[in-house]
């Protein structure tokens, strides 16, 4: 199991996702990695605060990171996520820290 302290940020994750890092530092917190899912050539690490860190499996570098919505949570846990994580994801969404898939569709981003 990976730990967040053992990972390093890529340029993309550190500079281009600085807005997300600020929200995580100020409001959500980093937490601990509770699940690792391997697909598309990299690990998607879920933390207990509702974050997903996309990590390169060979170099242990964080490629990108995002805050989960409920749709992604159910995908990661095969429609059986733990209750505490559902509550945390709902808390993040209700505070506006997550742009949900539906909101992105309305804004024309997808």
Language model features: what each stretch is:
Residues 1-110:
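Ribonuclease/tRNase effector modules and their secretory precursors
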């Amino acid at each position: 199991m990976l730990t967040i302290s053992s990972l390093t940020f890529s340029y993309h994750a550190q500079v281009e996702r600085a807005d997300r890092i600020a929200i995580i530092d100020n409001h959500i917190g980093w937490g601990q990695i509770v699940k690792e899912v391997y697909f598309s050539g990299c690990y998607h690490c879920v933390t207990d605060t509702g974050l997903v860190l996309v990590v390169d499996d060979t170099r242990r570098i964080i490629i990108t990171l995002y805050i989960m919505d409920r749709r992604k949570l159910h995908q990661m846990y095969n429609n059986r996520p733990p209750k505490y994580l559902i509550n945390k994801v709902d808390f993040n969404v209700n505070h506006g820290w997550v742009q949900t898939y539906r909101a992105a569709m309305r804004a024309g981003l997808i």
